[in-house]
């Protein structure tokens, strides 16, 4: 099987309980990654049909091999924002449930050549898909100091954004910043270490979000996804960043106010302390679930 780094699915039990309302329905994991949630759902609900989608060709190759013998799972490569088109190509109108697990996969985070990792030196890439034209290298080496500071502050929520952006612009006057370790070391020298978390963590997060236009993609995707959800169907979203969660929360609130359905999670669902201890990468995860249609009971 493809050498792909798997990770534990976050809040898997809660997702399985909140997402599935029809045990013979059609469900989509639109950010399938290494197939953690997808595998659990397919095993738990053998009479249901599942579609796993991912934009990353490495993930799709792995998923295709992993689920080759699983009759109720189909794997497709694509962007979750294009879900209506993907379903149309499969001659499917609407589905019973959709899962979005936002953010970065463990494989992407740890693979040096993908350019996401602070610990493993690699090119400044950070693209979820090799089809994308813009890389983190282009952003780091071509944006103005003001533009860089804005990205780092907005998407990384980094208070020292201006100081870091200035250091980047000064450094690239000598030579372009080409690798993840060059950028990580520059940030560390500029702001120093505070605690155990690497000082470049928020900078890398900001560049990843900007490179992949993650927030724009989410804004476009949610109303499109809602269209292909059946009455009574459920949309579950796991976010890891306050800006992502804010977008999801606002859409769900607006839909409920417009009478389009109910928020099944009035209060955001978070992983237990036990899960965080077992899987530290889940610590910032937030789960929200919306049920389309009027008259359902809250879980």
From Swiss-Prot:
Q: Name one GO biological process term.
A: rRNA base methylation
Enzyme nomenclature, EC number: 2.1.1.199
Its subcellular locations are:
Cytoplasm
Gene3D superfamilies, per database record? Putative methyltransferase TM0872, insert domain, Vaccinia Virus protein VP39
Q: Report TM segments.
A: none
Kindly report, in one word, the top-level EC class recorded for this enzyme. transferase
- What reaction gets catalysed by this protein? cytidine(1402) in 16S rRNA + S-adenosyl-L-methionine = N(4)-methylcytidine(1402) in 16S rRNA + S-adenosyl-L-homocysteine + H(+)
Coiled-coil residues are: none
Q: Name one GO cellular component term.
A: cytoplasm
* Pfam families the UniProt entry points to: Methyltransf_5
Q: Which family does it belong to?
A: Belongs to the methyltransferase superfamily. RsmH family.
PANTHER family to which the protein is assigned, alphabetical:
12S RRNA N4-METHYLCYTIDINE METHYLTRANSFERASE, S-ADENOSYL-METHYLTRANSFERASE MRAW
Name of this protein: Ribosomal RNA small subunit methyltransferase H
Q: Which organism is it from?
A: Coprothermobacter proteolyticus (strain ATCC 35245 / DSM 5265 / OCM 4 / BT)
Q: Which gene encodes it?
A: rsmH
């Amino acid at each position: 099987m493809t050498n792909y780094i798997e990770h534990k699915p976050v809040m898997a039990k809660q997702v399985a309980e909140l997402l599935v309302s029809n045990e013979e329905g059609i469900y989509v994991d639109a950010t399938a990654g290494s197939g953690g949630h997808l595998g659990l759902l397919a095993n738990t609900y053998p009479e249901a049909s599942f579609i796993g989608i991912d934009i990353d060709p490495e993930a799709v190759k792995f998923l295709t091999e992993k689920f080759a013998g699983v009759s109720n799972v189909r794997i497709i490569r694509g962007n979750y924002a294009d879900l209506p088109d993907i379903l149309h190509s499969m001659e499917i109108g609407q589905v019973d449930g959709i899962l979005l697990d936002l953010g970065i996969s463990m494989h992407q985070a740890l693979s040096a050549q993908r350019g996401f990792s602070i610990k493993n030196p690699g090119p400044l890439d950070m693209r979820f898909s090799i089809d994308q034209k813009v890389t983190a290298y282009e952003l780091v080496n071509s944006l103005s100091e003001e533009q860089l500071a804005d990205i780092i502050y907005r998407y990384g929520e980094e208070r020292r954004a201006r100081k870091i952006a200035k250091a980047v612009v000064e450094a690239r006057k000598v030579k372009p910043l080409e690798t993840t370790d060059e950028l990580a070391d520059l940030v560390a020298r500029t702001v120093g270490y505070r605690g155990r978390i690497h000082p470049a963590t928020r900078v890398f997060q900001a560049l990843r979000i900007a490179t992949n236009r993650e927030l724009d993609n989410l804004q476009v995707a949610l109303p499109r996804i809602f269209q292909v959800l059946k009455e009574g169907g459920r949309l579950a979203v796991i976010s890891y960043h306050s800006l992502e969660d804010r977008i999801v929360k606002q859409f769900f609130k607006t839909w409920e106010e417009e009478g389009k359905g109910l928020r099944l999670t009035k209060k955001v669902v978070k992983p237990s302390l036990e899960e965080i201890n077992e899987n530290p990468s889940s610590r910032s995860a937030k789960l929200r679930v919306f049920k389309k249609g009027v008259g359902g009971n809250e879980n």
